Amino acid sequence: MGVKSDIWIRNMAKNFNMISPFEEKQVRKGIISYGVSSYGYDIRVSDEFMVFTNINSTVVDPKNFDERNVVNIKGDCIIPPNSFALCRSVEYFKMPRDVLAICVGKSTYARCGIIVNVTPIEPEWEGHITIEISNTTPLPAKIYANEGIAQLIFLGADDNICETSYADKSGKYHGQKGITLPKVDK
């Protein structure tokens, strides 16, 4: 699998609506950067957050998730010490069948003890990316809404495209809008 360049990313965003909204250059002045980079795309975090809380003393169960585990926050977000938040990308993605994207956190946040996790973005998946953020520090951590949070690296198939894409298998997170909580197929 080859890594896709800024030229490929711009072409796919402009001609195939792979990323919307799309920023064709890196925006950096006075903010945490976002937009096209040499071999990736820095995504922004929206102003919607779900921060985990212990006020209801429920168990976090991925098979039976209780929405009382989270508090909704709009705007910049303060994640409590040693806590966790869910959020989403500003951008909506439509992945090509022959491409997989891997997401890595931005070093600006990582150097502050803020760890970003996103599972691979599979071929033909589309939607807003649900982003998981951990504050590993003993201090509150600020996340800036509508600024960069992570970078997507696009990997293209060398030969054959996949037999079954995310859309083909009707993946449970396909077409998600907003923050999507855990789901288990029943």
Curated annotation (Swiss-Prot):
Domain of life: Bacteria
Membrane spanning residue stretches: none
Keywords in alphabetical order: Hydrolase, Nucleotide metabolism, Nucleotide-binding
An MF annotation (GO) of this entry: nucleotide binding
Active site per UniProt: 132
Principal EC category: hydrolase
Function: Catalyzes the deamination of dCTP to dUTP.
Name of the featured protein: dCTP deaminase
